[in-house]
Amino acid sequence: MRKVVAARREPWHVLTMLYEHSGALKSIPFKEGFSEIDKSEHGLRSLPILEQHGLVWVVPSPGESIDVDSQMGGFSEDLEAFELSNYHHYETRTLRANMNWKLVVDTFLETYHLDVLHRETIAPILHGNTATFDAMGPHLRMIGARKTIASLRDEPEANWNLIEHSAMVYVFFPNTVFIMQGDHLETWRVYPDGDTGRSKMHVSLYTPEPAVSESAKRYWDKNMNLLMATVQEEDFPLAQNIQRDFSSGTQASIVFGRNEPALSHFHRAIRDAVR
């Protein structure tokens, strides 16, 4: 099987290099002009890759090794327990915003703002200004409680199901936000987009069962649309205002409260990584 992975297009002709899925160079157009080229020496760069805990892990530097359990520490047990290999990709959307990529990640790292900013959307579902926090190296886990968690008060602990009654937010340092949302999984892969004041993110939704029926598709479409509306109409306008304030130079620094440990940890990890 061949796969087109690189192409250069000009008004008067098209040049397309063909590579195997393995990365080996398969063919060169007008190969007579490259008669001395050894195709075996001009394949794509090989990167370390591993499938573990239902996820695909890639290191962007050739020659390095991957040890997921060592890197993720105790969070590996969480990933294994989620049985992610049973989940199914439903949809991915790409968003752009006029703010630094770290502000996108910040959006998920405190519940301080829920009762005010998300009064009609998330506040009826999740408790505001209440969350647990755990760090594992530069990575982190923050768990917000759903209002339904009160139903566990009289249940034996053996019957507790935390996933059903919480939103479990992980940051796989530095730029992946991973959220277990009761009945589905969200991932946010966030990147700079040209300069420090712009960002691009790929938002994916995964479901525990394939969405094959029309009712299932309507249900997951509603979930995805609610997610998009919440971040684009509530979170991002505020965050983009924060970005404008940063750019104006009116503040030399910002202060995180004791009720925002995930934010403090994330920015401390960024600072340590770039020293």
Report each predicted region and the residues it spans.
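Rieske [2Fe-2S] iron-sulfur-binding domain
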Residues: 1, 6-62, 66-77
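C-terminal catalytic domain of Rieske-type non-heme iron oxygenases
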Residues: 48-51, 55-275
